Amino acid sequence: MRFDGAAGLAQKMPMLGRVVQAAPLALLLGCCLILTLPASGRTLFYILCSLSLLFLPLAMFQRLEAKPKALNLLLSFALLIFIGFRAAWLWYFPAPTDAGLFPVAFAYQLSNKIWLSALPLLLFPLWSPFRERLSPAGATLALVSASALLSMITLKAWYDAHGVRVGLGSLYATGAAYLLCAIHFSALLLFHPFRLKKWQWLGLCLLIALQFMSIVATGTRAALLVYLFVLGCALLWRFGLYQSWRTYAIAALLSVATLWLSWAAVGSRVKEAQTDLIAYSQGNADTSLGIRFSLWDAGVHAVREQPWGQSIQARDVLFHQLVKDGALNKAALIMRDVHLHNEWLEILSLQGLPGALSWLIFLLGFGVYGWKRGGFFRRFALFYIGFWLVFGLSDVLLLSPQIAMFGAMFAALGLYLAPIFDARDERTL
């Protein structure tokens, strides 16, 4: 007799099925705790990873059709290639001897440990046979509540800081803004097929206003621009361009009111960017944007010199030599013990072209899996890949332990939500 794996356990132990049913809520809670209570979020992350590792061998024995099994193997291999290459790079190149570079080496080691720990968390929803699922309305309500609650927590912190840009928990303001965008976009994504009632439209408008103000509170220019762009695209995709004049009038009034409430913060960040650009054009790179431009220049030089990868220590020596030769602005050395503020340049400057290829395989794995699977996960995969690609242009997300844990739990959340929304019958909340 063939062993049915976790499917047999689901029949004999209904409580286990209920636990799996609650997995999306636990993952959503973990994502929220990473932002608000990082220590609790890390604890929950490792608990979920341990439970997934415990039940993953049972789930692997279930009967699957050929196509789902092939797709599962595709995504599994993409995850393994990304994690395996980073581990091989850490093993091959020696650790830095300069104490000032220890934080960089530790960040890479911790990041790889997090993704390795998260591997069972990502694989279990792929192979899990459990059929008990949350209702689509329940999942939507949970994500909308999380988005609204995080927005209010951010606005409360902003009020207490007297209008100064704020982060959440131990996360810096920029990272907090990126993770808030992920939660906010996922909440709006779940509204796509529903036909809302009039009072629900009002609630959705209030939710969007809260989301926008929470991004403004972080003072992150990239997150603000991306949020407005994605929101505009989502509205056009959902409703089309041709609407009544009342719809445009209400949208214009809401936009003007939101801009008026947030103009002090938005205007200050715009003026700061203009000042930084003027200073950089005059040769002063000791500003927020000036340091970023210098770091990007340093990353380009590193890729040209060592396209196949190098150690952290070797890259630092190269940067000092370039500054000494006058080929690089000395502002690039200010953050030598952090990162290059660009995901691709950070990967290429250390892990070379093979490292960039492994990261591309990771993203393409989600893309191909989502495209072939279709339904909800196709939209989620597009959004998930865009999160890493777009925000990775202005920061290095993989080296932040909170963002790495969030990214792993968020991907697992999408894998759990996919069958919920693919199998739904209802069209109204």
Please name every model-derived segment.
Residues 1-96, 125-137, 141, 190-199, ...:
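Transmembrane signal-anchor hairpin modules in multi-pass inner-membrane enzymes, especially those
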Residues 29-32, 116-162, 170-239, 261:
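Alpha-helical transmembrane segments of multi-pass inner-membrane proteins
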Residues 48-57, 123-124, 224-236, 252, ...:
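Hydrophobic transmembrane alpha-helices of multi-pass, membrane-embedded glycosylation machinery
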Residues 87-99, 154-164:
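Juxtamembrane "helix-exit" motif on the non-cytosolic side of transmembrane helices
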Residues 217, 238-282, 297-304:
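A membrane-periplasm/extracellular boundary helix in multi-pass inner-membrane enzymes
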Residues 245-247, 350-386:
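Hydrophobic transmembrane alpha-helices and their immediate junctions
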Residues 286-290, 294, 304-351:
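Long extracytoplasmic/lumenal interhelical loops at the membrane interface
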Residues 383-393, 397-429:
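Transmembrane alpha-helices of multi-pass inner-membrane enzymes
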